[in-house]
């Protein structure tokens, strides 16, 4: 099932040509609009004209977390504030939060990106979704909210907490889809069983869970207590938010929106590798986001080849 079938089923050769075109564009745009990148890429001798293939990405210097902190709050923005219509921020648990801005076009692309991962797991315009993420600077709630609305779903912005009221809405509104963290979905399920209402009063058929890790055991528990189809998705506020990747109905791993994100896997960036050697770090370019371009951003996330 596809939301933007032409893009999502694009032949590999055409996709890589699009990635190259967008990579060159974002490099040129960043040099012209972000002083930090004008200096950093200039020192490295990188220009859009010198990028002839996707493998040339290795000539581009990494953008690190320290670079983000040093340019707080808007030093890496690539658009004037009058063009920024939304601001989100990371939690800032290790220091100052990362401020991310969105132009109107960014928000439009983001909604389609989220719509893709939702449709891929069976969401339709007949679904009624309750979003039990906390609203605010966190990208998760509003990201899923507008993506689901884009599909045509009815969206209930319940936010987090007040579990008794959450359960009442699930029952009374005959909610068919739930957005929550896996741990809160489990807690809600246990609370529902203790509430005195039969579980048959709940009509949830699908869950879009994220914002924290979900073990296979947790997924099994969630599906058992709710009788729903549990799915996982992934995103970072720095790139866009939820929608960077997500499962499909086969649940064979997370599918990346490769027309929008160029992800490369590296082994020796100086990060400590945990557990098995198959884990790597992944630098990312989010290709078409002019509000705050990220050029070869090293996120340090672990990945595993399946």
Q: Which sequence ranges carry the predicted segments?
A:
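Short helix-loop-beta connector
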Residues: 123-127
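Nucleotide 5′-phosphate-binding alpha/beta core
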Residues: 1-89, 94-112, 119-120
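AMP-binding/adenylate-forming
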Residues: 103-117, 128-187
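Hydrophobic alpha-helical segments that mediate membrane insertion or helix-helix packing
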Residues: 90-91, 129, 148, 263-265
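Short internal alpha-helix immediately C-terminal to a glycine-rich phosphate-binding loop
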Residues: 114-121, 191-195
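Gly/Ser/Thr-rich beta-alpha loop segments that engage phosphate groups in nucleotides
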Residues: 94-97, 136, 182, 237-239
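Active-site glycine/GP-rich loop and adjacent strand/helix microenvironment
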Residues: 2-14, 18-31, 35, 151-306
């Amino acid at each position: 099932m596809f939301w933007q079938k032409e893009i999502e089923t694009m032949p590999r050769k055409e996709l890589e040509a699009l990635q190259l075109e967008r990579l060159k564009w974002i490099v040129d745009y960043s040099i012209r609009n972000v002083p930090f990148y004008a200096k950093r890429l200039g020192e490295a001798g990188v220009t859009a004209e010198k990028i002839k293939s996707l493998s040339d990405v290795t000539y581009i210097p990494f953008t690190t977390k320290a670079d983000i902190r040093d340019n707080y709050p808007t030093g890496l923005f690539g658009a004037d504030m009058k063009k920024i219509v939304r601001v989100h921020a990371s939690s800032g648990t290790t220091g100052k939060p990362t401020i991310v801005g969105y132009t109107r076009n960014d928000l439009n692309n983001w909604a389609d990106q989220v719509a893709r991962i939702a449709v891929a797991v069976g969401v339709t315009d007949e679904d009624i979704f309750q979003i039990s993420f906390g609203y605010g600077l966190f990208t998760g709630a509003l990201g899923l909210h507008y993506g689901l609305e884009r599909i045509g779903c009815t969206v209930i912005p319940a936010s987090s907490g007040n579990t008794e009221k959450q359960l009442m809405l699930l029952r009374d509104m005959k909610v068919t889809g739930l957005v929550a963290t896996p741990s809160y979905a489990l807690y809600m399920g246990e609370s529902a069983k203790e509430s005195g209402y039969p579980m048959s009063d709940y009509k949830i058929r699908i869950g879009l869970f994220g914002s924290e890790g979900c073990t296979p055991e947790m997924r099994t528990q969630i599906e058992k207590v709710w009788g729903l189809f549990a799915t996982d998705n992934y995103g970072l506020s720095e790139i866009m938010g939820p929608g960077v990747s997500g499962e499909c109905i086969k649940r064979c791993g997370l599918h990346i929106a490769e027309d929008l994100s160029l992800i490369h896997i590296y082994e020796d960036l100086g990060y400590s590798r945990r557990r098995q050697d198959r884990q790597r770090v992944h630098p990312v370019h989010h290709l078409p986001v002019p509000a705050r371009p990220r050029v070869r951003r090293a996120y340090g996330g672990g990945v595993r080849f399946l």
